[in-house]
Amino acid sequence: MYKKIGIIYHPLNPAACDLAIKLTAKLDSLGIENWSDSAWQADKLTSKMQNTQLIFTTGGDGTILRTAHAILPLEIPILSVNLGKVGFMTELSPEDAISGLEKVLAGDGWIDERSLLEAEYLPHDSAQSRQFFVMNDAVVARGQVARVICVSVDINSQPFTTYKADGAIVSTATGSTGYSYAAGGPVLQPNSADIILTPILPHLGRGYSLVLPSDSTVDLQVNTWHEATLSIDGFINMQVSSGDTLRLRRSSKKVKFMRLRPNNYFYKELDTKLKGNNESVYDR
């Protein structure tokens, strides 16, 4: 029995806000403790997560990414409503939100576990390192000036290559349908723990993606006279300097999704979603 449920919504999507209100009213009518807040206030949600057993999201994949970061290192299941455009990670249509909630409360559903990466940012000047969880991808890329950068790659502490390119992407299986795919990377089955390494527009060569075993460690070192950036899951962004390193490895933590569809849903919907990948502004 669920005793406490959270609702996290996209604050700039009116439909997402309205649905959050309806879900709150439904939970109130059932006498279930609940709370709701904006996905853009994720850093302020820690205290609300205490004893929360399920998180309902109303938005798109971007809302889910922010929610996952807010939940971690806890592993509270996420039940998501697609009010974005593509919704690779979402579970329910807006029309099915209330009935989907009722089914889960009645004991239906199964847990879909997704692997994460842990990223450690190591500045070249020995300043304090920073740690991040990565659900989709970590991207080291050029800045606003249209100049290629060099990204040296080590795999398991052994030199692999240096990309002279717009950057490089390290992706999870969950993120394989995102930026990595757009850069020519493969699509992995979402429960895979493998890691994808993909260059972005490499100079003097087509480049190729590499699928690495789940126990791999990948180091990306920036070498450039120009501006460079680091982006984690598309919303944690910072400038980086020449000599800085990003170290990535698989995390022991998981992100858990509550599913109501059959467990072959990914293959049934993959082709349709990839062909119709026209993102809504509200999916960011």
UniProtKB/Swiss-Prot annotation:
It catalyses: NAD(+) + ATP = ADP + NADP(+) + H(+). Transmembrane segments: none annotated. It is found in: Cytoplasm. Its cofactor is a divalent metal cation. Its EC number is 2.7.1.23. SUPFAM superfamilies: NAD kinase/diacylglycerol kinase-like. Belongs to the NAD kinase family. GO terms for cellular component: cytoplasm. It comes from Dehalococcoides mccartyi (strain CBDB1). The keyword Transferase applies. This is NAD kinase. It holds the Pfam family NAD_kinase. NAD(+) binds at D61, G62, R66, N136, D137, R147, K164, D166, L201. GO terms for biological process: NAD metabolic process; NADP biosynthetic process. Involved in the regulation of the intracellular balance of NAD and NADP, and is a key enzyme in the biosynthesis of NADP. Catalyzes specifically the phosphorylation on 2'-hydroxyl of the adenosine moiety of NAD to yield NADP. Its main location: cytoplasm. InterPro entries: ATP-NAD_kinase_N, ATP-NAD_kinase_PpnK-typ_C, NAD/diacylglycerol_kinase_sf, NADK. GO terms for molecular function: ATP binding; metal ion binding; NAD binding; NAD+ kinase activity. The active site is at D61 (proton acceptor). It comes from the Bacteria. Keywords: ATP-binding, Cytoplasm, Kinase, NAD, NADP, Nucleotide-binding, Transferase.
